[in-house]
């Protein structure tokens, strides 16, 4: 959990706040409409808790070591996301997980596979649905986009109607 706190502190310093995230924005717009998660908070945090003590120590050491370069990487990730540049986003994410391929598998790939049945169910429903996931789940060969396309789901990347520049690197 210490590595998560280090990462969240860096994000907060750069102006990326959960209070200003897309989930809060859409929740306010949706009002009393039904919402549900693809997983619980406990399930997502459980992924980090399931790491061995050695893996947790390595993750904390890496977070501390990379604290100086994290703002630049985060800004690059945000820019790739805002530009809709999936290949660049995938390359940046893979670079970030280079030292921890098993963590990427657990945090991204395994969760994508686990979420597919729920997303399939939403797509078959009669109501409109919005699925919100982190950007790491949207790019690459095991992304939700790729997995859904393999199942024949037609996806269209939407253009931003407004552009927000990524926060400046301190």
Task: Set out the residue ranges of the language-model regions.
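Structured, acidic catalytic/metal-binding patches in enzyme active sites
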Residues: 1-103, 107
């Amino acid at each position: 959990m210490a590595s998560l706190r280090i990462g969240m502190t860096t994000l907060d310093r750069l102006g990326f706040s959960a209070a200003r995230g897309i989930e809060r924005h859409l929740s306010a717009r949706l009002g009393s409409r039904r919402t549900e998660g693809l997983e619980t908070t406990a399930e997502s945090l459980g992924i980090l808790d399931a790491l061995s003590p050695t893996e947790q120590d390595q993750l904390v050491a890496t977070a501390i070591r990379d604290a100086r370069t994290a703002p630049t990487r985060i800004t690059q990730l945000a820019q790739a996301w805002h530009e809709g540049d999936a290949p660049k986003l995938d390359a940046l994410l893979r670079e970030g997980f280079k030292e921890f391929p098993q963590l990427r598998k657990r945090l991204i790939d395994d969760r994508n596979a686990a979420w597919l049945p729920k997303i399939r169910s939403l797509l078959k429903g009669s109501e409109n649905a919005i699925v919100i996931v982190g950007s790491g789940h949207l790019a690459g060969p095991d992304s939700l986009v790729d997995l859904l396309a393999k199942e024949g789901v037609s996806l269209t990347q939407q253009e931003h109607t407004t552009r927000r520049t990524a926060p400046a690197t301190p």
